[in-house]
């Protein structure tokens, strides 16, 4: 029997920041970001749930697409827009419960095999990475590069695609040239000397939003 697909999302998700705190969720929503992911690490359970509840409420207030990384039970419990899972989470997560709750599902992939596995689950979007070397998290795989990204995007026409991994503002035009529908960033915003300016530049490059006149 065919696996039922997860609810759809926009084909082009645009700028997709991945951040680790409620503070960043608040900042980026106020700055006009409409797709983002909360990836909390190393926090106690009570704090995690409190932050996820608050983030979901903020996402709804701004009518944004907020994905919760890893904590799928809390995402289901509190009615999140969506969940993002890594390959290592797919065997332990209750995918049927996520699907039945009406949540969107994004899946990380790091090579052709993982991409094929993701497609069998019919998720809402597929993340392709890591494209460039990254210091944000330890990666067991090597960077895929732009040629591999371009090939995978062309071979994944039925799903929204997200490029992730080591993507700086300077690299964004080259990433977009592959045809990928969304660009995920972490340090390009969170480690920027002026995060508001960096966010505005990324929204301009990826979504065509106008830059405010700089005086």
UniProtKB/Swiss-Prot annotation:
Binds 1 Mg(2+) ion per subunit. It comes from the Bacteria. Belongs to the thiamine-phosphate synthase family. It catalyses: 2-[(2R,5Z)-2-carboxy-4-methylthiazol-5(2H)-ylidene]ethyl phosphate + 4-amino-2-methyl-5-(diphosphooxymethyl)pyrimidine + 2 H(+) = thiamine phosphate + CO2 + diphosphate; 2-(2-carboxy-4-methylthiazol-5-yl)ethyl phosphate + 4-amino-2-methyl-5-(diphosphooxymethyl)pyrimidine + 2 H(+) = thiamine phosphate + CO2 + diphosphate; 4-methyl-5-(2-phosphooxyethyl)-thiazole + 4-amino-2-methyl-5-(diphosphooxymethyl)pyrimidine + H(+) = thiamine phosphate + diphosphate. Its cofactor is Mg(2+). Keywords: Magnesium, Metal-binding, Thiamine biosynthesis, Transferase. 4-amino-2-methyl-5-(diphosphooxymethyl)pyrimidine binds at residues 37-41, 69, 108, 137. InterPro entries: Aldolase_TIM, ThiamineP_synth_sf, ThiamineP_synth_TenI, TMP_synthase. The keyword Magnesium applies. Pathway: Cofactor biosynthesis; thiamine diphosphate biosynthesis; thiamine phosphate from 4-amino-2-methyl-5-diphosphomethylpyrimidine and 4-methyl-5-(2-phosphoethyl)-thiazole: step 1/1. SUPFAM superfamilies: Thiamin phosphate synthase (SSF51391). GO terms for biological process: thiamine biosynthetic process; thiamine diphosphate biosynthetic process. Condenses 4-methyl-5-(beta-hydroxyethyl)thiazole monophosphate (THZ-P) and 2-methyl-4-amino-5-hydroxymethyl pyrimidine pyrophosphate (HMP-PP) to form thiamine monophosphate (TMP). Pfam families: TMP-TENI (PF02581). 2-[(2R,5Z)-2-carboxy-4-methylthiazol-5(2H)-ylidene]ethyl phosphate binds at residues 134-136, 166, 186-187. Its EC number is 2.5.1.3. GO terms for cellular component: cytoplasm. One of its GO terms (molecular function) is thiamine-phosphate diphosphorylase activity. This is Thiamine-phosphate synthase. Mg(2+) binds at residues 70, 89.
């Amino acid at each position: 029997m065919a696996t039922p697909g997860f609810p759809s999302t926009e084909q082009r998700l645009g700028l997709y920041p991945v951040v680790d705190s409620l503070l960043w969720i608040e900042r980026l929503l106020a700055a006009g970001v409409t797709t983002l992911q909360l990836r909390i690490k190393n926090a106690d359970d009570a704090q995690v749930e409190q932050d996820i509840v608050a983030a979901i409420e903020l996402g709804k207030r701004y009518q944004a697409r907020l994905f919760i990384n890893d904590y799928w039970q809390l995402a289901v419990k509190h009615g999140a827009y969506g969940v993002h899972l890594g390959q290592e989470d797919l065997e332990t997560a209750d995918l049927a419960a996520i699907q039945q709750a009406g949540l969107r599902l994004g899946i990380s992939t790091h090579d052709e095999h993982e991409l094929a596995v993701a497609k069998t689950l019919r998720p809402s979007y597929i993340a392709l990475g890591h494209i460039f070397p990254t210091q944000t998290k330890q990666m067991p795989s090597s960077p895929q590069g732009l040629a591999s990204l371009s090939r995978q995007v062309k071979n994944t026409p039925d799903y929204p695609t997200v490029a992730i991994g080591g993507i700086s503002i300077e690299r964004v035009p080259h990433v977009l040239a592959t045809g990928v529908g969304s660009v995920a960033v972490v340090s390009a915003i969170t480690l920027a000397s002026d995060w508001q300016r960096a966010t505005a530049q990324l929204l301009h490059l990826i979504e065509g939003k106008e830059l405010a006149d700089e005086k």
